[in-house]
C-alpha cells in the first residue's frame, strides 16, 4: 500500500501540494491585517480550525477513493483469501494510509506555523498529537464509507454529505456555543467539533495535556477512530458474506 501510493504523483500532490496551496490563499486573505489591540490577525484565530479541517478533508477523500480501488480491482478479495483476519486487514490499511496521513498533518502544521507565521501558544507536540488522532479517524471513516460506493464518483459524492455539516456545525465558521440548541446538540456527533475545540484550547489558550477538557476531546476522537475502524471491518464481512 505504501509503495503503491508513493508511486502515485497525483496522490502526493493531493496530500502535500493541495493543502499548502489552499493555506497560502487563506494566508494571503486573512493573514495581513492585525488587530491593533491584540496584534492578532484573523488567520491567528482561524488557524486551529483550518489545521483540523484540511488534515481531515484530504486524507478522508484519499482513503475512501483508494480503498474503493482495492475493492473494485479485486485486490481486497485476494487478500481475504489469505489467512489474515479482517481486523488485521483493516489494521494494515490503517497503517498504510496512516503513514501518509501523519505526513500530511505534519506538512499542514509546519506550513501554518513556519510559512504563515501564525501566533500560537501551547505545545506544538500536543497540537500534532491531536492532529494525528483526528487523521486516523478520518482514514477509518474513509475506509468505512467506501463500502457504500460502487465507483470513485459515488465515493466523492459522499464528501459533501459528510463534510458540509461539519463545516457549519463544528465551530469552523461559527462558534458552537452560538448555534441554536438543536444544531449544537447535532455538532456533538462530529469529530471536527472536538478536534477544533482541543486545538483552540492549545493554540489560543495555551492549555496542555494536563487539562481535563483536552483529554476528554482526545478520548472522544480515539473512540471515533475505533468505532469507524470497526464499521470498516464490518463492511468487509457484509461484502463477502
Predicted feature descriptions by range:
Residues 59, 103, 107, 137, ...:
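Residue-level signal for transmembrane alpha-helical positions in Major Facilitator Superfamily
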Residues 175-216:
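Short hydrophobic, aromatic-rich alpha-helical segments embedded in or entering the lipid bilayer
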Amino acid at each position: 500500500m505504501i509503495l503503491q501510493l508513493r508511486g502515485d504523483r497525483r496522490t502526493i500532490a493531493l496530500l502535500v501540494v493541495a493543502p499548502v496551496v489552499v493555506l497560502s490563499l487563506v494566508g494571503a486573505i486573512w493573514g495581513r491585517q492585525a488587530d491593533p489591540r491584540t496584534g492578532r490577525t484573523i488567520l491567528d484565530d482561524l488557524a486551529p480550525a483550518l489545521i483540523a479541517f484540511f488534515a481531515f478533508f484530504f486524507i478522508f477523500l484519499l482513503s475512501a477513493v483508494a480503498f474503493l480501488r482495492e475493492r473494485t480491482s479485486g485486490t481486497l478479495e485476494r487478500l481475504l483469501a489469505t489467512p489474515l483476519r479482517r481486523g488485521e486487514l483493516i489494521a494494515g490499511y490503517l497503517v498504510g494510509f496512516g503513514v501518509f496521513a501523519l505526513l500530511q498533518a505534519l506538512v499542514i502544521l509546519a506550513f501554518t506555523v513556519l510559512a504563515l507565521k501564525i501566533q500560537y501558544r501551547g505545545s506544538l507536540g500536543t497540537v500534532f498529537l491531536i492532529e494525528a488522532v483526528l487523521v486516523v479517524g478520518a482514514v477509518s471513516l474513509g475506509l468505512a464509507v467506501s463500502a457504500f460506493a460502487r465507483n470513485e464518483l459515488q465515493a466523492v459524492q459522499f464528501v459533501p454529505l459528510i463534510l458540509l455539516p461539519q463545516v457549519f456545525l463544528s465551530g469552523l465558521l461559527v462558534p458552537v456555543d452560538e448555534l441554536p440548541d438543536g444544531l449544537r446538540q447535532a455538532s456533538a456527533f462530529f469529530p471536527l467539533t472536538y478536534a477544533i475545540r482541543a486545538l483552540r484550547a492549545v493554540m489560543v489558550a495555551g492549555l496542555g495535556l494536563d487539562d481535563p477538557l483536552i483529554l476528554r476531546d482526545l478520548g472522544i476522537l480515539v473512540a471515533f477512530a475505533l468505532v469507524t475502524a470497526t464499521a470498516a471491518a464490518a463492511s468487509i464481512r457484509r461484502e463477502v458474506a
